[in-house]
């Protein structure tokens, strides 16, 4: 007599069916992260294209900011709401627009729409990298690296204005608008002298340098494994052997610097660590600016420059430049304040 012992098949619920459908092998992977990524990315991009095409900033900044008004790709923007609205979410059905779409656009509601959907879209993209890494069976360092751009976006577009009086002081979504924001950060926060900005610059430029050095070194040490003039055709994605000589690369840089990477894993981790850490440091610095924290103030140089007309340093010159940015930028940047500065209070260099 034969006795078959088995387990009854577990019932598949709606969650299992949905999980199978989301993770099905298709040209563009969806996944659970796609439920957040695709709608948010679509709405953020659509809101930006709509705003830059048709929506004016006359009611919020007193400027033209759309293609419809004569702007071009470098000058159009989705502008921040007016200063008077504070940190309102600017919902379409909220007390500001009261369900009127045209009024909502005029008051700057599209900026909140693009900023919030953009932030969640970026988070969805990072979760997508986590999800695919788990399914493929690789480590999640791509997702961890992408936390750097997310930190910068959230700190600049959300944390900074939350620390200030309103969304008005966040950057608008446009090329020239971002440049204006950079000048604003310099004039009102002396951002370039901030150590976190310095670490950010070192990280980004250092990452670019490492990338250039690594790419050039690999190209220099490719194995001569083809008779063709084009070395790229000699590579096969599934080949088992190395395509370049790490030993030769190590000898080359050892002769130049006296020191070189001998471990590929450490080398590539360093290429990940430098730029991502720079982005994180910049984000921390922006949060500090949101709280109006000061960085370096060399008061002794300022006092001596005030007492001695012949004493001047690059620091004191930059302080004067910052005063100039504030004095001349504020009336243009914040027309609602109706600033009027008489000529005698505008900054002048010691030599004038």
UniProtKB/Swiss-Prot annotation:
* E.C. numbers: 1.10.3.9
Q: Which GO terms describe its biological process?
A: photosynthetic electron transport in photosystem II
Cite the binding residues for chlorophyll a PD2. Answer: 197
Instruction: Give Gene Ontology CC terms.
Output: photosystem II; plasma membrane-derived thylakoid membrane
Q: Does the keyword Glycosyltransferase apply?
A: no
Q: Which UniProt keywords apply?
A: Chlorophyll, Chromophore, Electron transport, Iron, Magnesium, Membrane, Metal-binding, Oxidoreductase, Photosynthesis, Photosystem II, Thylakoid, Transmembrane, Transmembrane helix, Transport
List, alphabetically, the Pfam families matched. Answer: Photo_RC
Positions the record marks as coiled coil are none
The reaction(s) this protein catalyses? 2 a plastoquinone + 4 hnu + 2 H2O = 2 a plastoquinol + O2
What is the free-text note on the cofactor?
The D1/D2 heterodimer binds P680, chlorophylls that are the primary electron donor of PSII, and subsequent electron acceptors. It shares a non-heme iron and each subunit binds pheophytin, quinone, additional chlorophylls, carotenoids and lipids. There is also a Cl(-1) ion associated with D1 and D2, which is required for oxygen evolution. The PSII complex binds additional chlorophylls, carotenoids and specific lipids.
Quote one Gene Ontology molecular function term. chlorophyll binding
Q: Where does a plastoquinone bind?
A: 214, 261
Q: Which residues cross the membrane?
A: 40-60, 124-140, 152-165, 207-227, 278-294
Query: What general EC class does the enzyme of this chain belong to?
Result: oxidoreductase
Q: How does it sit in the membrane?
A: Multi-pass membrane protein
The subcellular localization recorded is: Cellular thylakoid membrane
Q: Where does Fe cation bind?
A: 214, 268
Residues that bind chlorophyll a ChlzD2: 117
- Residues involved in pheophytin a binding: 129, 142
Q: Which family does it belong to?
A: Belongs to the reaction center PufL/M/PsbA/D family.
Job description of the protein: Photosystem II (PSII) is a light-driven water:plastoquinone oxidoreductase that uses light energy to abstract electrons from H(2)O, generating O(2) and a proton gradient subsequently used for ATP formation. It consists of a core antenna complex that captures photons, and an electron transfer chain that converts photonic excitation into a charge separation. The D1/D2 (PsbA/PsbD) reaction center heterodimer binds P680, the primary electron donor of PSII as well as several subsequent electron acceptors. D2 is needed for assembly of a stable PSII complex.
Mention any additional remark.
2 of the reaction center chlorophylls (ChlD1 and ChlD2) are entirely coordinated by water.
Q: What PANTHER family does the record tag this protein with?
A: PHOTOSYSTEM II D2 PROTEIN, PHOTOSYSTEM II PROTEIN D1
Read off the HAMAP family from this record.
Answer: PSII_PsbD_D2
Q: How does it assemble?
A: PSII is composed of 1 copy each of membrane proteins PsbA, PsbB, PsbC, PsbD, PsbE, PsbF, PsbH, PsbI, PsbJ, PsbK, PsbL, PsbM, PsbT, PsbX, PsbY, PsbZ, Psb30/Ycf12, peripheral proteins PsbO, CyanoQ (PsbQ), PsbU, PsbV and a large number of cofactors. It forms dimeric complexes.
Protein name per Swiss-Prot or TrEMBL: Photosystem II D2 protein 2
Q: Source species, please? A: Synechococcus sp. (strain ATCC 27144 / PCC 6301 / SAUG 1402/1) (Anacystis nidulans)
Q: Which gene encodes it?
A: psbD2
């Amino acid at each position: 007599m034969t006795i078959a012992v088995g387990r009854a098949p577990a019932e598949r619920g709606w969650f299992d069916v949905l999980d199978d459908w989301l993770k099905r092998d298709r040209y563009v992977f969806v996944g659970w992260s796609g439920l957040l990524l695709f709608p948010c990315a679509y709405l953020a991009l659509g809101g930006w294209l709509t705003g830059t095409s048709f929506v004016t900033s006359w009611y919020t900044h007193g400027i033209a900011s759309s293609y419809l008004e004569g702007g071009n790709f470098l000058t159009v923007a989705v502008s921040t709401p007016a200063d008077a609205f504070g940190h309102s979410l600017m919902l379409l059905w909220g007390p500001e627009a009261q369900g009127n779409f045209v009024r909502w656009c005029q008051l700057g509601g599209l900026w909140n729409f693009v900023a919030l959907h953009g932030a969640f879209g970026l988070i969805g993209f990072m979760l997508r990298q986590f999800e695919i890494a788990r399914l493929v069976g690789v480590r999640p360092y791509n997702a961890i690296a992408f936390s750097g751009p997310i930190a910068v976006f959230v700190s600049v577009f959300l944390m900074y204005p939350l620390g200030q009086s309103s969304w008005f002081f966040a950057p608008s979504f446009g090329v020239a608008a971002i440049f204006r924001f950079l000048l604003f950060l310099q004039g009102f926060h002396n951002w370039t002298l901030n150590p976190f900005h310095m670490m950010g610059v070192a990280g980004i430029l250092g990452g670019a340098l490492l990338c250039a050095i690594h790419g050039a070194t690999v190209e220099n040490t490719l194995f001569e494994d083809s008779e063709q003039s084009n070395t790229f055709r000699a590579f096969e994605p599934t080949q088992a052997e190395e395509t370049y000589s790490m030993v030769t690369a190590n000898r080359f840089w050892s002769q130049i610097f006296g020191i070189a990477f001998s471990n590929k894993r450490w080398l590539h981790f360093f290429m990940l660590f430098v730029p991502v850490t720079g982005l994180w440091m910049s984000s921390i610095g922006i949060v500090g600016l949101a709280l109006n924290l000061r960085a370096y103030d060399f008061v002794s140089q300022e006092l001596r420059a005030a007492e001695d007309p012949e004493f001047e340093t690059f620091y004191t010159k930059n302080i004067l430049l910052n005063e100039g940015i504030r004095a001349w930028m504020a009336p243009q940047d914040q027309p609602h304040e109706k600033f009027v500065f008489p000529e005698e209070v505008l900054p002048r260099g010691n030599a004038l």
